[in-house]
Amino acid sequence: GQRAAKATRQSGDVAVGDTYVFRYPTDADAAILLRIADREVVAFSQKCTHLGCVVYFEAEEDRWHCPCHEGNFEPRTGEVISGPPPRALGRIDVEIRDDTIWALGYQP
């Protein structure tokens, strides 16, 4: 995948259970991260793999959700749970370093 490191946010700005929308790997690519635990974050392309609608996190259902055609994805892996999407969400490698959340690469 593409490997350009980019600081996305101070980790203190994103509470556990919250999401943050950013742009990666380019300024035209919407991405979203979820802070699962104090030192655990995951991030994905915000574009559904079905027809490209915007996905968001549904905390009460513990899933990524696409409202266009009811596609649902597993929160940690981005794998398809249900609906028409043909494959998992594009995954962004993220990690917390020195209280900054870094995006380190993208796997479509």
Where is each model-derived feature located?
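Short glycine/serine/threonine-biased micro-segments
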Residues: 50, 69, 76
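Short cysteine/histidine-rich metal-coordination sites, predominantly Zn2+-binding motifs
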Residues: 62-70, 80-90
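Short Cys/His-rich "knuckle" micro-motifs
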Residues: 56-59, 74-78
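Hydrophobic beta-strand positions
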Residues: 33, 72-73
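N-terminal pre-ligand scaffold of iron-sulfur
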Residues: 1-59, 87-108
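A residue-level detector for well-ordered beta-strand positions
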Residues: 42, 71-72
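Active-site and channel-lining beta-strand-loop segments
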Residues: 73-74, 94
